[in-house]
Amino acid sequence: MDPHPCRASRPPRAEEPGQREAEHPGHRPTFGTKAHFGFMKHEVGKEPDPREATQLALPKIFHQNSHMFRQDSDSFMFHVAVKYGCVGKQGWRASDVDFDDDGVTVTGRSGAPGAEPEAFRAQYVVDASGFRSPLAEKFDLRDRPARFKHHSRSMFTHYVGVKRFDDVSGHPKELRPPADWHTGTMHHLIERGWFWIIPFDNHKDSRNPLCSVGLTMDERTYPKPKDLTPEQEFALFLDKYPAVKRQFDGASKVREWVSTDRLQYSSKQTIGDRWCLMSHAAGFLDPLFSRGLSNTLEVVDALTSRLLEAFKDGDYSAERFEYVERLEQGLLQYNDEIVNSSFIAFSHFRLWNAVFRVWGSFITPGTMRLTRARLKHFKDKDQRHFRELEQNDHPGLWWPQSDKFKILLETTSETCEKYEAGALTGDEAADIIFKLLDDSPIVNPVFGWKDEEKRFIYPSVATMGRFLYWASVQAPPEMNSVGREFLLGIVKAGSKVRKLL
């Protein structure tokens, strides 16, 4: 993969009114289905207790969620960009970026043998590379060390033949979750780490036999060995957790392992005159909770709306893009709070059960907030509905206009850190967070987030109806308007609502 895919930007060709949208990639036969986020706690040398598991199943109306097979989804988006006028330069490495009063010069060359250097002029540069960002290196933008509290390293590959956890767990039916583990993203939790099992073959229409497999763990607890290959180290971890190991009986890897050092990196600055470090070029935290594409697309939305205006008046100053900076840094900061809390809590189930609810309880209103803007835009085509999303005090928080949620998240983080430091027991920390959830008027009581015994959250259509009533009528004002307008938008969208959701 090209480590320096720095791209010069120019305005895309506008889509003609009435033009058909490109094929939606969400139902491709190489993608898996993502019906839930599933979590099972494991201890060294023991069988997992089925009572120490949590699951957030997605409402059926949202079941177009996918385990995206990235080589296909990325190819899809690349060809959409080419369709709209982007000039593709595959295997092209940027070696230098120079700025002047009139624009930017990006210099590099193709990876083909004997290729000559090339230079491209642009008005603005979006560096969407990653850890080895050319702009971060040029302007010395990296924090050293990364400013995040969270620590982890990772190893990952693709397998064939990974068994369904439902088939190897040995758990009785009455203690299993309502959605099969195999139908979603499986997180096997260990002390300060987690395995992921992400199948692409978990529905009848799949034509992809692969399964994404990985292990992410705190590198301070598990220093990276110098005398083992990643495959050998992974095998040693499997030997510690018998139920996870059974999933790999007879399975085979189909690509080489990738093994990282510490994953976390951050930047002092992500926006400047005529440039942007976008998403993974700006920083990275951890794959837990699958925030990568979501964060990227939030930044794309905020950045492109401003770029289109800049192309009209020629103002590419950092001041114009100041909100993008706050959004990028906020996305990383708030993710650090919840992921660090989660890693601390993995070894104590009650504490994890509490942190799980802080994370999960605001996914639905966060999604509703975005969908409400789409529904309103669908009705009148007014772009202001998207601009209004940015009118909040906490960019990057997944419910960004809620002071109450920010306080809940930060208090959860502080409580977990006290447990980590030995100032609280795990049960004391869990009690504090459960009381915060129970006392909070903005935490949805309908799904079961306030009920410690309800470990599997599986909202039916009827439950969604009760939730929308609560959100529209009984919830605090910051939720009421979203609930009412979301419900009204669904009614007005009629048969097209599923596409908009």
Regions found by a protein language model. Give the residues of each.
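C-terminal non-catalytic accessory extensions
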Residues: F405-L501
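N-terminal FAD cofactor-binding segment of flavoenzymes
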Residues: M1-E43
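Helix-loop-beta segment of a Rossmann-like dinucleotide-binding subdomain
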Residues: K46-R70, T105, T216-R220
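A conserved FAD-binding loop/helix module that cradles the flavin
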Residues: L285-T304
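Predominantly flavin-linked oxidoreductase catalytic cores and closely associated redox partners
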Residues: S75, H79-A243, V300
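Long, charge-rich C-terminal accessory regions
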Residues: S347-G448
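FAD-binding beta-loop-beta segment adjacent to the flavin cofactor pocket
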Residues: E256-M278, G283-P287
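Active-site-proximal substrate-binding core of FAD-dependent oxidoreductases
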Residues: D301-F356, L370, R374
